Amino acid sequence: MALSFDSLTAAQIAAGVAAGDFTATEVAQASLAAIEAREGGVQAFLQVAPELALEAAARVDADRAAGKSLPPLAGVPLAIKDNMNLVGTRTTCASRMLGDYQSVYTATCVQRMLDAGCLPMGKANMDEFAFGSSTESSAFHRTNNPWDTERVPGGSSGGSAAAVAAGEVALSLGSDTGGSIRQPASLCGVVGFKPTYGAVSRYGVVAFGSSLDQVGPFGRTVEDVALAMNALTGAGHDPYDCTSQDCAVDFTEHLNDSIEGKRVGIIPAFMEAEGLTPEVKAAVQRAAQELQNQGAELVEVDLPHLDAAIAAYYVIGPAEAFSNLARFDGIRYGYQEEGCANLSDQSSLSRAHGFGAEAKRRQMLGAYLLSSGVYDKYYYAAQKARTLITQDYDAAYAKVDTILMPASPRTAFKFGEISDPTQMYLSDLYTISLNICGNGGISVPLGLGEDTQLPVSAQLVGPAFKDRQLLMFARALERGFADTVTGAPALSVAPDFAGKGGEL
């Protein structure tokens, strides 16, 4: 009986390639077949890279044939968010502004995954320049949620989440500025991890908010995400990124340790927040009960300044975005308006026609917030709020080891259902504060919601650079929900896509 590629985790694929059960080339071909069979329904990719994938697979197979030791993720198919440079592909940020831009170097995070043996299957769709929570702002096409193709996959890393949920790849990379890994992971029913700020190099990743952005992995299981973190951090500090920290540890070492006696924080106000749906609330309450059943102590904690997080984020984020996107001027590279009489017209018209509505909105807001007379009033206040929120978390972590909360206030919504940008911003209600303070957070699937029968998740957050401990708690939660969706790799692929193409 043929083995379905999407029934295997990244760990199982790497083990199978190392053991000779199948070749890396066979895995690459299976992933490409799955993409061909499923992509029409999910539209997770902006560019598929069969040549790069097969070349990488051939190198893995040649090394094995020569008796060389294989890297830990040898033969594992990987999707890469399209704001990360990879030589041999375009890096468009899902924007007309960079529609034809060819990567001239490879991002450190991508290179480290390739060095670990991953096969680059292509570039995943996203919200334009990572501005959004639904992947609807992509200039090229929408990405559909594999659990219901009339609903959004979340964003901005929607393509990365959907590619894993549809079983097209085993791992993917995303970036998280305000929840852009954890929220789509929640809506698509996969594991999504935002490490501590500085844990993963951002060199070669097109910047949105430089003090907020962090790269992280998506996978079907917590173990797969831990293996990806080993690859992303194993080489230590990246000299090309001044924020990069040397935090190389084996993220799998204590993954299955008991959490008995550990303390899990619960924020009562978060569970009563406006917009939190009953099915998500019930799922998170079940998660708390499961952790308690495994011996953890539930402790109420207070984060009194958290209600300022969204306001602070939408000052700091747009201000940094305005600065970062000023380089896209239509002169040096990117979209260039034709027929302009002078450089001023070329720059202004190229930006007017190259950027989409949300990208313009964020930059206009940033320009206003950085203007004379406004900067002192709002930007300083936002930075003060940032300090207070960080202090709140530090005080909480003096009492608990991790904090449990929702990852998203609701399950996946239908395309066009949320048209008001300010309402869309509330999709990141539970995730933004982690980018404000820089701590790690992970979205863990809890099965399907009672009302919508769509994926629901819980989020676990932890102190800075305690990411290995955070993964241990995530694995404990995953064990507790193994009979629903989480922990059963074959079931973590959306049923409408499972088994379509991709036989090994």
Please report, for each region that a protein language model flagged, where it lies by residue.
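Immediate post-signal peptide segment of exported/extracytoplasmic ligand-binding proteins
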Residues: 60-76, 255-267
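Structural helix-boundary/capping segments
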Residues: 37, 115, 166-171, 177-274, ...
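Residue-level signal for inorganic ion chemistry
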Residues: 31, 53, 106, 225, ...
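Long amphipathic alpha-helix in the N-terminal Rossmann-like dinucleotide-binding domain
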Residues: 51-61, 117-118, 127
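An N-terminal boundary/leader segment
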Residues: 1-54, 276, 280, 286-289, ...
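Serine-dependent amide/ester hydrolase catalytic core
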Residues: 14-18, 272, 305-306, 327-436, ...
